[in-house]
């Protein structure tokens, strides 16, 4: 792949529109895996996705021009999957499995396009919503976040000259490479790129992926970004997300259906996928509640992704649960992915080394760590905690509790109802940085 002069590319913004999203494959792999299941099992469910800025001190509508945001969103709606992309999806092997995507699904995907959006400004923030069939609105999550984060980066750098930009990217590259050198010291490390949604830019994410590929070799197991996986001959990685249990819980008509929603998701998932894709995401309504009510067969799955508890605490809780089910944790997999950086990766790796198989999904602090890199102080280069969550399913409010109350989303009355139902034990409030 040809190298790009990042500083020169940023400085030479003389074209009318520089599209941030240039392919529908510029998304996380698990969105396609989930989409196939949604298409197959829930084609008549409507779902609304909404932008949520958890760093409320950052006034996005004051930093990002509304016209530029609309232009980028409008451009993304013009995209279709190309013939090359469809051939790759049909013919490539994912997780050791050929034809993971059904021919009927790919035929439907051929004509796919992103649905309309609803955008307005309020109190210095953007209210951005995507209404419509779940099969379509789900695919807005990643491009919407990538667009807003990159527009914010562009706005922060627009007054920097070519030499200042050179210094910025030189320092960011050196900072990234110092992390690579530390990761080399972990002999059995398995780490992947999970940084699409909050990246500084697509080109910077590509540079980081190439740096990891060269710098740590086989310890770098792949990327969640489907386009980068295709272009760089890497594994496309990802399992499933909170939206699945959130939607099924919102659709529940009885207490039994609500209680069983997280496990019905796993049963649905098992109908479509197996092996290393059998990874449990337990924290949508609190990991403690999930483990307390989990059927025994959940312990047979390949592993867990503890996503919102502190990694060591969350990992220990799952290991103890496996042991209570008669399972050997050394044969199981824990994937850590919440707000990781080198310090937490090293600490977590050394804590669990030899006790459990581990994987690390490295996100924001891989693809958007520019702190201290600019020649002058620029607040707009600091990563923020921005998410796009399902907020409604067939007219019913959707809720996420999380193991960290700071990450809870949904109507406050519904959040309170879910807390009464699932319980509040072992949820620990932590500052959400990214």
UniProtKB/Swiss-Prot annotation:
EC number: 6.3.4.21
Enzyme class: ligase
MF terms (GO), sorted A to Z: nicotinate phosphoribosyltransferase activity
Gene of this entry: pncB
Gene Ontology biological process: NAD biosynthetic process via the salvage pathway
Family: Belongs to the NAPRTase family.
Post-translational modification: Transiently phosphorylated on a His residue during the reaction cycle. Phosphorylation strongly increases the affinity for substrates and increases the rate of nicotinate D-ribonucleotide production. Dephosphorylation regenerates the low-affinity form of the enzyme, leading to product release.
Keyword Disulfide bond among record annotations: no
InterPro entries, alphabetized: N/Namide_PRibTrfase (IPR041525), NAPRTase_N (IPR040727), Nic_PRibTrfase (IPR006406), Nic_PRibTrfase-Fam (IPR007229), Nicotinate_pribotase-like_C (IPR036068)
Modified residues (Phosphohistidine): 242
Domain of life: Bacteria
Organism expressing this protein natively: Brucella canis (strain ATCC 23365 / NCTC 10854 / RM-666)
Keyword Ligase among record annotations: yes
Function: Catalyzes the synthesis of beta-nicotinate D-ribonucleotide from nicotinate and 5-phospho-D-ribose 1-phosphate at the expense of ATP.
Name assigned to this protein: Nicotinate phosphoribosyltransferase
Gene Ontology cellular-component annotations: cytosol
Reactions mediated catalytically: nicotinate + 5-phospho-alpha-D-ribose 1-diphosphate + ATP + H2O = nicotinate beta-D-ribonucleotide + ADP + phosphate + diphosphate
């Amino acid at each position: 792949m040809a190298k790009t002069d990042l500083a020169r590319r940023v400085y030479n913004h003389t074209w009318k529109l520089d599209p941030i999203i240039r392919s529908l494959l510029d998304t996380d792999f698990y969105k396609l895996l989930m989409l196939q299941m949604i298409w197959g099992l829930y084609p008549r469910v409507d779902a609304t996705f909404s932008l949520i800025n958890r760093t409320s001190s950052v006034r996005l509508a004051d930093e990002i021009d509304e016209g530029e945001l609309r232009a980028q969103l409008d451009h993304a709606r013009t995209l279709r999957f190309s013939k090359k992309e469809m051939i790759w999806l049909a013919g490539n092997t994912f997780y050791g499995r050929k034809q993971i995507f059904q021919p009927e699904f790919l035929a439907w995907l051929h004509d796919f396009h992103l649905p309309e959006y609803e955008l307005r400004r309020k109190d210095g923030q953007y209210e951005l919503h995507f209404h419509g069939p779940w099969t379509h609105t789900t695919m807005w999550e990643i491009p919407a976040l990538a667009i807003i984060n990159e527009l914010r980066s562009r706005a922060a750098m627009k007054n920097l000259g070519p030499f200042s930009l050179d210094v910025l990217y030189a320092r960011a590259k050196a900072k990234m490479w110092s992390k690579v050198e530390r990761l080399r010291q972990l002999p059995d490390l398995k780490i992947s790129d999970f940084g699409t949604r909050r990246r500084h830019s697509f080109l910077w994410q590509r540079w980081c992926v190439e740096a990891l590929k060269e710098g740590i070799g086989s310890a770098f197991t792949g990327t969640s970004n489907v386009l980068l996986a295709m272009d760089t001959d890497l594994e496309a990685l990802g399992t499933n997300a909170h939206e699945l249990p959130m939607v099924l819980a919102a659709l529940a008509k009885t207490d039994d259906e609500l209680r069983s929603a997280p496990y019905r998701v796993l049963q649905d998932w098992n109908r479509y996928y197996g092996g290393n894709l059998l990874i449990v995401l337990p924290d949508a309504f609190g990991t403690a509640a999930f483990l307390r009510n989990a059927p025994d067969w959940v312990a047979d799955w390949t592993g867990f992704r503890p996503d919102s508890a502190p990694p060591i605490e969350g990992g220990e809780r799952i290991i103890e649960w496996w042991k209570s089910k008669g399972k050997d944790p050394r044969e199981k997999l824990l994937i850590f992915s919440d707000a990781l950086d080198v310090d937490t990766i090293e600490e977590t790796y050394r804590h669990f080394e030899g006790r459990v198989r581990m994987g690390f999904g490295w996100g924001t602090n891989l693809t958007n760590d520019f702190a201290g890199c600019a020649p002058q102080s620029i607040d707009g280069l600091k990563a923020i905690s921005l998410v796009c969550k399902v907020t409604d399913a067939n007219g019913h409010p959707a809720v996420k509790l999380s193991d960290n109350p700071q990450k809870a989303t949904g109507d406050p009355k519904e959040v309170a109802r879910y807390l009464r139902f699932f319980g509040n034990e072992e949820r620990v409030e932590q500052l959400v940085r990214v």
